């Protein structure tokens, strides 16, 4: 049985077909699921923009064509033995990158819309078992209090459980996915952390991140006159905060990876230190992209010799590094 107390170790990617309204909304490609499965991975997260699901900014409308595309993605997951996690990356009243006109954390209307959307998903997919499907409520909430966060998430949890009492539910950590919450855990749901530390490596020259264009040249391990910091530094400064949840096996790494402006050799060294931690603590994970600037295909890295594998321009070194850590 797949529950928040028996959280499997899934490994895979985010697919962004429902990610940004009018920009990246497109049908899922069955070949992506087939290839991800053939390469040994078993998890895909769908970060979604509520405006795609609603066909715009009116929360009371559901775009049935968008829902059918979501149905198709979930069906592909089942066909290729891949667990699908659906996530509201942009929710009514909140987006980590671009502010919404209302506030999910303080305003009644977006809170009601948020819970209603999750109730709709719960009803529609109630017959799909947890081994195939989970719900990740909202992407990377801000640095709000535990009390506020838990109160808003409880509304969505209640809406889900009214329709689908046993659904596996995941909540991202506060402070952009970096801080665990005891109150969230009391709701009987799992939590997801991030693997982007330090951002000077993961988001070097990422134009959507404030200050990233001014980061100095990245290095890994971090070197100074007094320190040589690699895997132990990552654990102490990022993952150790999650130790209770890690030891209880009810957390995973919902996003991680590095943008294509960081030199490839540095990215691979940094990734392997992260992967060693994931292996030691039996953590599941998902790279932010499958195809894109963080991904293993079509990532646009100037210092990679890409190979055509299954019709994908593939970063073989990164692919093989990830595959090295698929068994634990």
Residue locations for each model-derived region?
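Boundary/entry segment of secreted carbohydrate-active catalytic domains
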Residues: 1-25
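Short, solvent-exposed turn/loop segments enriched in Gly/Ser/Thr/Pro and often Arg
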Residues: 47-49, 88-93, 173-175, 286-295
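Active-site region of glycoside hydrolase catalytic domains
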Residues: 106-232, 236-259, 280-283
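Aromatic-rich peripheral "rim/lid" segments of glycoside hydrolase catalytic domains that contact
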Residues: 263-328
């Amino acid at each position: 049985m797949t529950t928040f107390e028996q959280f499997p170790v899934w490994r895979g990617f985010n697919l962004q077909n429902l990610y940004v309204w009018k920009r990246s909304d497109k049908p899922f490609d069955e070949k992506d699921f087939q290839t991800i499965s053939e390469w040994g991975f078993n998890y895909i997260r769908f970060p979604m923009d509520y405006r795609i699901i609603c066909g715009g900014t009116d929360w009371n409308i559901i775009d049935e064509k968008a829902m059918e595309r979501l149905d198709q993605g979930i069906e592909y997951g089942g066909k290729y033995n891949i667990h699908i996690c659906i996530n509201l990356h942009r929710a009514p009243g909140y987006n980590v990158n671009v502010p919404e006109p209302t506030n999910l954390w303080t305003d009644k209307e977006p809170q009601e819309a948020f819970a209603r959307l999750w109730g709709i998903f719960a009803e529609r997919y109630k017959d799909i078992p947890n081994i195939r499907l989970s719900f990740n409520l909202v992407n990377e909430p801000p640095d709000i209090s535990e009390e506020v966060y838990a109160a808003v998430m409880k509304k969505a949890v209640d809406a889900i459980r009214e329709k689908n009492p046993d659904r596996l539910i995941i909540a991202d950590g506060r402070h952009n996915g970096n801080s665990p919450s005891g109150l969230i855990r009391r709701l009987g749901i799992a939590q997801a952390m991030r693997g982007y530390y330090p951002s000077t490596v993961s988001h070097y020259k990422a134009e959507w991140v404030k200050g990233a264009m001014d980061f100095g040249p990245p290095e890994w391990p971090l070197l100074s006159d007094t320190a040589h910091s690699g895997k132990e530094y990552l654990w102490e400064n990022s993952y150790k905060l999650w130790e209770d949840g890690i030891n209880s096996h009810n957390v995973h790494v919902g996003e991680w990876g590095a943008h294509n402006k960081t030199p490839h050799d540095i990215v691979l060294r940094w990734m392997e230190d992260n992967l060693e931690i994931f292996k030691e603590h039996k953590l599941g994970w998902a790279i932010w992209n499958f195809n894109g600037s963080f991904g293993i295909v079509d990532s646009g890295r100037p210092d990679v010799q890409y190979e055509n594998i299954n019709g994908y321009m593939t970063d073989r070194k990164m692919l093989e590094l990830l595959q090295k850590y698929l068994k634990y």
